[in-house]
Amino acid sequence: MASLGRQVPEWHRLLALSWACLVRQTPHLREQKQMSPSLSCKLTTVPGRGSFQEFSSITPQKYMQEPENRTRLVQCLHEEQKPCVDPESLEPEKVIRSLQDMGFAEAHIHSLFSIQPSVHPQQLLGIVSELLLLGLNPEPVFNALKKNPQLLKLSSMQMKRRSSYLRKLGLGEGKLKRVLSVCPEVFTMHQRDIDRVVKVLREKCLFTAQHITDVLHRCPTVLQEDPNELEYKFQYAYFRMGLTHLDIVRTNFLQYSITKIKQRHIYLERLGRYQTPDKKGQTQIPNPSLRNILRVSEAEFLARTACSSVEEFQVFKKLLDQEEEEESESHASEEEEEEEEEEELL
């Protein structure tokens, strides 16, 4: 009986402490604390000498003098009330650490997450990893994603399939690296559009497999061109300017617009500074190199190649536009006449 009496105060203190901790963390229980008779009544215990003694109800302030028991109980309460951590909330942190390990700067990492906010962090990490496997450094990868944010919406499998297809065209890791840097849209284009361009280069322009590889490596934007316009550009170079397949490939001829090509070529032709080679590839005058025709600024072209003024070239371009417009209208009227004749025959 005496031992039971000694255990009662300890039990009473623990009960009071538990209630006090809960009241502090849960405000709406304070009113219940005031109304609870079990914590406000006096306890009667039996001391060691056998006489009864009354103990007042133990308040939280009194129990604060028991540091060891208080610390143990508070730790238990905190462990029970500790919220669960969602594993998905930790994924951005893991992705950030992975990007840092790959060599990305903090500013680039922040920008990567803002390029496509709706993209899952793990998907972003997968695309970045695939691009790095192509041989790119973090800086070119960041620039490619910034230039074409749609890359982040691809799956890793789609990236692998497109990379595999481009490798079949002869674009290995080194060449594929340049293609992605210059024209990242290659990875998000429809497969049929790429096939059409490759078909024109092979069947209409009669480029060899090696020529096609070199064209795509040197001028990746060719893949974005309309196949019919690409064919016309080749025909103009081959028949009007007398260029060979090798000339077209080595000078990156197909990357220039047909408007720029015609303006500068025809202008030189009318000035007597360019002549179409004969079947043997010979001319009566030395033609300027394609580099000095197309790969220079307009000011340098006029000063060094055409030896003409800006005003004269501007007037020529306006006249050339009128000629092409009239030619187009004439061609359209001829087609209408042919259609009418066919209808009359039917």
From Swiss-Prot:
Major location category of this protein: mitochondrion
Repeat positions for MTERF: 142-172, 177-204, 209-239, 245-270, 290-318
Annotated localization: Mitochondrion
Keyword Transit peptide: yes
Annotated region described as Disordered, given as residue ranges: 321-346
Presequence extent in this chain: 1-42
Subunit description: Heterodimer with NSUN4; this interaction may be required for NSUN4 recruitment to the mitochondrial large ribosomal subunit.
Protein name, UniProt field: Transcription termination factor 4, mitochondrial
Species this protein is from: Mus musculus
Gene: Mterf4
